[in-house]
Amino acid sequence: MNISIPQIIAAILNFIILLLIVKHFWFDKITAVVDSRQSEIINKIEDTDKNQKLALELKEKNELELGNAKKQGKTIVEEYKSKAENVYEDIVKEAHEEADRIIKKSRLEAERQKKNAEEEIRAEAVELAVLVSSKTLEKTIDDLEHRRLIKDFISKVGI
C-alpha cells in the first residue's frame, strides 16, 4: 500500500471539516450533557457528604439520648426500689404495732378475766364460808354481819 502526501493532506482536511461540522451541530449538546452529568455527580457527592455528616450527628445525638435514657431508667428503678423499701418498712412497722396492740389488748383481757375470776372465787368463798360457819355455829347471825366477818377474814388471809 502506497500512501502519498496528497492522500494524507486530504485525510487531514476531511478530519478537520468533520470536526468543524460536529462542533457546529453537536458539540454544544454534547458539552451540555457532559457538564450536566458532571454537575449531577458533584451534587450527588456533596449530598452524600452532607447526609453522611447528618447521619453521624444523628448517631451521636441518639447515643447521647440513649445514655440519658439509661440514666433516667436507672434513676427511676432506684426511686421505685427506694419507695418499695419504704412501703415494706411501713408494712413491717404497722404489723409490729398491730401485734403490740393485740398483745396489749390480750393482756388487758386476761387481767380483766383474772379479776372477774378472783371476784367469783371470793364470792364463792364467802358463800361457802357463810354456809360452813352457819352450819358449825348452828346459830344464825344476820346474813350481812356474817358476810362482813368473812370478807374481813378473807382480806386478812389474802384470797
From Swiss-Prot:
InterPro entries: ATP_synth_B-like_membr_sf (IPR028987), ATP_synth_b/b'su_bac/chlpt (IPR002146), ATP_synth_F0_bsu_bac (IPR005864), ATP_synthase_B_chain (IPR050059). GO terms for molecular function: proton-transporting ATP synthase activity, rotational mechanism; proton-transporting ATPase activity, rotational mechanism. It comes from the Bacteria. Disulfide bonds: none annotated. The chain crosses the membrane at residues 2-22. The gene is atpF. It holds the Pfam family ATP-synt_B. Belongs to the ATPase B chain family. It is a single-pass membrane protein. HAMAP family: ATP_synth_b_bprime (MF_01398). F(1)F(0) ATP synthase produces ATP from ADP in the presence of a proton or sodium gradient. F-type ATPases consist of two structural domains, F(1) containing the extramembraneous catalytic core and F(0) containing the membrane proton channel, linked together by a central stalk and a peripheral stalk. During catalysis, ATP synthesis in the catalytic domain of F(1) is coupled via a rotary mechanism of the central stalk subunits to proton translocation. Keywords: ATP synthesis, Cell membrane, CF(0), Hydrogen ion transport, Ion transport, Membrane, Transmembrane, Transmembrane helix, Transport. This is ATP synthase subunit b.
